[in-house]
Each structure stands twice: as structure tokens, then as C-alpha cells.
């Protein structure tokens, strides 16, 4: 099934069930108001949502018109919040090996490299991204992420995968010029990781069929910067640590509670002709080939679109479409 959260003036929004073709949605009010409620009681509530999802898809006739018997409405991605607008935990990592670029601190070592990000204020898929300065090195990061249920302390990678409830896409914004100084302090990124946005829709793994296997999502992640396609990266390629590894690593000394979100980092493809999912990887490749980086980071007014299509050619999660805007006094207000 496919789930989204619609804006309703509150911080947590309203849970909606979305048709498979992403054309219409139906409020899940009679079952649950918030996605976190469903994650907390997954075994009881998710079958009810599945029934609504099946009915919503059945209500669409061969012409693609929704039956008036269903209280469905055309979905507008601009009205979507992040599927989980705020979460108990957001942990992002660097699961990919990029053979085209020199290894960095995030890709070295025997185990996964993870950092704890801000989870109290996720951004919607079409929300503009305010930044204080272009000099901070504004970079997008197109990623695949998962939302988990409870995962026990000491879970193995296989057991950890049993805790995956939903898949989604992320844009984990990074301010590259601030990152080295923070990493040098030894405490991980803070100011350099200001905003994370998510796809309008989160989906259960069965929605992608055999493309989800062994903790990897074997589909192409597409990134378009200012309308120009810069990345068609295979998300299942060059995965050094799959989601089972990432979650098990996190659970080595703690347990996870339902509603934790885990990201795998910018998708990196072994074939350089497939482009990139973050500007930093492109600049690293340029430095390796030419001795210096030529591609600049994002500027005010730039846009980024991140999307993944299934093997049927249809969008799986909907698209993240964001514009970089200068921070204004009104924007900075609560």
C-alpha cells in the first residue's frame, strides 16, 4: 500500500491512503489520523489500511476515473508533508561504494558509517529550502530510506530487515563547506545538515515486488538539477551495507522504536555515465580525473527533482521537487 500525510494546519498532518497510480487519495480518518499511530500498532491497523487501499484501487475503472462511491480526491503533492512529519529518530549513513571517486571518511572502516540527524522537523516534498548563504556549499543528496517498526537490541541483519515497514525517498540537504569543520571536531554533522525532505508517498515493500530484495531496492533513482537530468543511478548497485546491516549496526547497543527512519546515503552508481545523486560525488570524480573540481554547488533559485520509477515505468513514491531560496527574516520566524 501507499501512504502519505496531508497538510491540515497541524504539525503531524492527516494520514491518507494513496492509489497505486498516485492519482487520488482517501483520508484514513476512520482507521488512524497519523502515520505514527499506525506504526505503533502495525499488526492491527495496517490490515485495515490495506483493505482501504485495495478498495481505492478497485474503485478505479478502465478509464482511470475514480468511482464517486469512494470519497477519493485528486492528490496534490504540494499539499503533502513528509509521510512522517516528525520522527523519534532519523539516522543517515553512507552505504554505497563509489569506485569512481576517492574514498572519504564516510566510506572507510569495517562497518557502516552513520550519523544522527534532526528528526523534529522534516520538510515536505515540494517545500522551498531556505539557506543563509550560497557560500555554504549547498548540495542535494538523493537517497532511499526506510521507516521501521520496533527492532530489538542485538538484532541480526536478517532480523533487522523484518522490522522494515515502509520505503521512501529522501533529499538530505548538506552544506558542504560547513561539514569539514564539524567532522574535525569529532562529534558529527550539525549545522551542515540543516534540512531533510521526503517523497510525498511512502510504500510498503511489496509495492515494488522483487525490486526489494535482501535489504536493497534495485530501481533507478533519477535526479534532475534545474530541469537537467544529472543522475540515473541504480539504487541496488554498489551497496556496501544494505538496510539490514545499517539497522543491525544501529541496534548493536540499543533498540529501535517504531517510527525510526534510516537513510542509506546518496545513491552511488559504479557506472559514471549514469551521473550522480549528490554534487560532492561529481566534484570528487572531477578532482580525480582533472585535478580540480569544476561543478559548483547549488545557487538560490536552483531546483532539484528526485524520483524513482518502477519496472512498469510508473512513479513509485511521487517526486521531491524543491527550490533553493535565500533565508528571509519571515522565513526564519517560527
Task: Please give the residue ranges for each predicted region.
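Short, well-ordered loop/turn sites that connect or cap secondary structure elements
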Residues: 250, 255-256, 298
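Active-site microenvironments in enzyme catalytic cores
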Residues: 2-8, 19-21, 29, 33-233, ...
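Active-site pocket scaffolds in enzymes
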Residues: 261-301, 307-309
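Generic structural signal for buried aliphatic residues
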Residues: 144, 256, 262-263, 304
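Short, Lys/Arg- and Gly-enriched loop/turn segments at beta-strand edges
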Residues: 154-156, 270-278, 311-321
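Structural signal for terminal/edge beta-strands and the immediately following C-terminal loop/tail
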Residues: 305-334
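Short beta-strand-centered aromatic/proline hotspots
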Residues: 16
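Short, solvent-exposed loop/turn positions at domain surfaces
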Residues: 132-134, 250, 292
